[in-house]
Design a protein with these regions (language model features):
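Sec-dependent N-terminal signal peptides
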Residues: 4-12
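Glycoside hydrolase catalytic-domain context in secreted enzymes
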Residues: 12-671
Length: 671
């Protein structure tokens, strides 16, 4: 009898040891089968938990229990929350080891233009017209963020924006459809690589779908009046480019679109995004946007708001907690089909598998600090900052001569470390190189470089005046009705010029500004945006001629706020040129695509592959570009199209391609 019992016990242990793991845990199984297997095992409550993204708070005493119950699908980590990598992995361990099914939590953070190493604001990145360099910056940002446990960034923003009063114009690529599409796709590739599950990669969440940048009067959250034609021609193409680049997530916007809020809009979220484009990632609402459907006036209460959002195609809600608290009852009462919940959960799980969270849930680097602010990161930040800056005026004062006797550096931004913009990731101002430090490091040994406060006289060979708007004058809901330089800075520039100085104005801005009162008093005018960690070095590289400026404007700079909205690609009218004001014409102070350098380029031999093309046929264009100056430099070749006899009115000019090339003096290249 004892022998029999021991044999049975041994057989039991053998069977237990060889029990088959659930299919969803098998990393070799097809992704779709893993998703279906896991979904079939989930309760309704667990499904709704996957659709919930609350805000991480270090003082939240209920979070561990919520994760254990499977009620947290993702956590949004706000700037300043200081989620340490060890704490992130502790929370993930609860999800993986203590929840019933072991579904990992996805951690999201705003990595907008860098994590610890900060690159120029996105509008500045677009001014580089160098998508390859933008992709490199996103790759570095992903590496830093991933090392600290971040799985997904709420970036890129690809909202076409044509009103500089809108504070969030700083976060996108400006007024042009193609620039937003090209740079958005480049950032997606940089964040995700060819496999977003690899070490050092993070998922991209493209935002804000759709029309957010067309807010009435440049006032954040305002409604938009956009026809389906306007959506398809202007506002949707950048999102399509990002979806085609493989973005795993899309964020729905705050605004309404011609009466239907974007976060309850079945046309855009379901018909276009999913059915037409084949998007199979998940849609995330913007912060509290599901709850705010009540404020829009289309939902009587939170339960109705949740049903409308999920039905339209919002898979996961950020912070509002309505899915978890109301949708169980809505499903039981047949006000929401259970199949729609499954659709949303399937999308979320698909992304978690794609990001490798099930197979590698603990992503933090064992020594994350080693991955931050590396020499490569700082080199890339310096190059991108320099290429993003746009020289708008130069009356022969730049580049600065090494033989100058004296340089006065002045203005609020001369020693400021407020150089990161509104979204700063985990950037530390102490890492930033100031303009003062950058200029001092590159000035000639015999040049007296001084701050204005250190000089009894304001007279010098050259005055470098650092002006601009701080990071809290742009960004989300930081809209301006007056877009001139604030704080009396125009007066400072004028006074320095009237005292006989050569005046070089460096502007640190997050939007196009009205600089009409500055231009007459500036011998040189450089737009620096908010350039990031290597700001001062990049400015000095350009001022002293270590590099030639190569940035071009991604937005039009107006002569007056009264011209807004203003953009280059407006449609032709029956009376072209007559759309003016009593006091001024309709032309910008500085147009889209404009930017000077320290050399000259000559264009020649424009060639087309064919002079006549049938509908659907492609036409190739080539042109030869020659550096006719004396300095190695980069030039952006821009190709525009005008359809002179179309079925509908078309833009007078439309950017259809561009190439940035570097040429030595006398060198030619065909592009």
């Amino acid at each position: 009898m004892k022998t029999f019992l021991l044999t049975v016990a041994a057989c039991g242990l053998l069977l237990a040891g060889t029990a088959k793991e659930p299919l969803y845990r098998d990393s070799s199984a097809p992704l779709a089968e893993r998703v279906d297997d896991l979904l079939s095992r989930m309760t309704l409550r667990e499904k709704l938990g996957q659709l919930s993204q609350p805000l991480y708070r270090s003082d939240d005493t209920t979070l561990d229990a919520c994760i254990t119950r499977g009620e947290v699908g993702s956590l949004v980590v706000a700037h300043g929350s200081a989620l340490a990598p060890a704490e992130r992995d502790r929370l993930q361990r609860i999800a993986v080891e203590r929840s019933r099914l072991g579904i990992p939590v996805l951690f999201g953070f705003d990595v907008i233009h860098g994590y610890r190493t900060l690159f120029p604001i996105p509008l500045g990145i677009a001014a580089s017209w160098n998508p390859e360099l933008a992709e490199a910056s996103a790759r570095i940002a992903a590496s830093e963020a991933s090392a600290c446990g971040i799985d997904l960034t709420f970036s890129p923003m690809v909202d076409v924006a044509r009103d500089p009063r809108w504070g969030r114009i700083s976060e996108g690529s400006g007024e042009d459809v193609l620039l937003n599409a090209v740079f958005g796709a480049a950032l997606v590739r940089g964040y995700q690589g060819d496999d977003p599950s690899k070490q050092g990669r993070i998922g991209a969440c493209v935002k804000h779908f759709v029309g957010y940048g067309a807010a009435l009067g440049g006032r954040d959250y305002q409604f938009t009046e956009l026809s389906e034609r306007a959506l398809r021609e202007t506002y949707l193409p950048p999102f399509k480019a990002c979806v085609d680049a493989g973005a795993v997530s899309v964020m729905s916007a705050f605004n309404d679109i011609s009466g239907t809020p974007a976060s309850a809009n079945a046309l855009t979220l379901d018909r276009i995004l999913r059915k037409e484009w084949g998007f199979d990632g998940y849609v995330l609402s913007d912060w509290n946007a599901v709850t705010e459907l009540q404020e829009h006036g289309i939902a009587a209460d939170g339960a109705e708001a949740a049903v409308k959002a999920l039905t339209a195609g919002v898979d996961m809600e950020m912070t509002s907690d309505l899915y978890l608290t109301t949708l169980e009852q809505s499903v039981r009462e047949k006000r929401l089909p259970a199949a729609l919940v499954d659709r949303a959960v399937r999308a979320v799980l698909r992304v978690k598998f794609r990001l490798g969270l099930f197979d590698r849930p603990f992503r933090s680097h064992p020594e994350p600090d080693r991955m931050l602010l590396t020499p490569e990161a700082r080199r890339t930040a310096r190059q991108l900052a320099a290429e993003s800056m746009v020289l708008l005026k130069n009356d022969g004062v730049l580049p600065l001569s090494p033989d100058l006797r004296s340089i006065t550096v002045t203005g609020e931004w001369a020693v400021s470390r407020d150089l990161y913009g509104w979204w700063v990731g985990m950037g530390d101002g102490r890492d930033a190189v100031t303009v003062w430090d950058g200029i001092r490091s590159q000035a000639g040994g015999r040049t007296d470089v001084r701050l204005m406060s250190q000089s009894r006289s304001r007279r010098s060979d050259v005055a470098v005046v650092c002006v601009g708007e701080n990071g809290y004058l742009f960004g989300e809901n930081n809209n301006r009705s007056d877009i001139r330089l604030p704080y009396g800075q125009e007066q400072l520039i004028r006074e320095l010029k009237e005292q006989g100085n050569k005046v070089v104005v460096v502007v640190f801005n997050g939007r196009p500004l009205d600089l009409s009162a500055v231009v007459p008093y500036a011998d040189a005018l450089l737009i620096a945006w908010h350039p990031g960690t290597e700001a001062g070095n990049a400015v000095a590289d350009l001022l002293f001629g270590k590099r030639s400026p190569s940035g071009k404007l991604p937005v039009s700079f107006p002569k007056s706020v009264g011209q807004l909205p203003l953009f280059y690609s407006d449609r032709t009218s029956g009376r072209p040129g007559n759309d003016r004001y009593v006091s001024m014409d309709g032309q910008p102070l500085f147009p889209f695509g404009y930017g000077l350098g320290y050399t000259t380029f000559e264009y020649s031999e424009l060639r087309l592959s064919k002079s006549v093309a049938a509908p659907g046929e492609q036409v190739a264009a080539e042109i030869t570009v020659t550096n006719t100056g004396g300095m190695k430099a980069k030039e952006t070749v821009q190709l525009y199209l005008h359809d002179k006899a179309a079925s509908f009115t078309r833009p007078a000019r439309m950017l259809i391609d561009f190439r940035k090339v570097e040429l030595a003096p006398g060198e030619s290249r065909t592009v």
